[in-house]
Amino acid sequence: MDSIEESKIIRGAYMVQLHPFGDERGRFMETFRKDWFPQRNWDILQMNRSDSKAGVLRGLHYHHHQVDYWYVTRGMVRAGLVDLRPSSPTYRRTQTIEIGEFNEIGLFIPIGVAHGFLALTDATLTYIVDNYYDNGRDENGIAWNDPDLQVDWGTNNPILSRRDAANAFLRDIPAEKLPRGYGRFPRPCGLFGPITIGPSENKV
């Protein structure tokens, strides 16, 4: 059985340790099941694929009406999370974790937690969401190198899109554009054991 554990750094973010099964033909692995999160009544509405060259950084992005579930199908990325929910007990904490071929983790990101990733190699990220893409109303950004947040990307010179390069620092974003609540994801039922993330789970 796959195991799931809530982040010790950001409340409501979850990491699923995935377990492949292989034989002489190859291997098989479940990467997502709705019943891994049995207390969440959600509808999966869209699945996306993002291909990135090594050195590309995408983010930081956040949503008011969408949760994400990430799985890296090729290569390795360093995922970065920032809790932007004012009423959260982990407000403004940050976390990075390396996920991909050599650390096969599914990453659940709740509403109000900013997220992004640095491609450590050429990489493919697949992710499912519970709302349709809405570029006008629910695609928001914060500067990847915000000095008040200090996300540990491990680089000072990533490849950025023009849009991400123009993202503002958190202190310069109007309060009405930031998440207001704590989010809407309860703890899962106690069906799963803890997982060991290893040295990639690092910064507060």
Regions found by a protein language model. Name each.
Residues M1-I105, A123-Y127, D134-V204:
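Non-catalytic, conserved peripheral segments adjacent to functional cores
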Residues L107, H115-L120:
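Short beta-strand His + acidic residue motifs that chelate non-heme Fe in jelly-roll/DSBH
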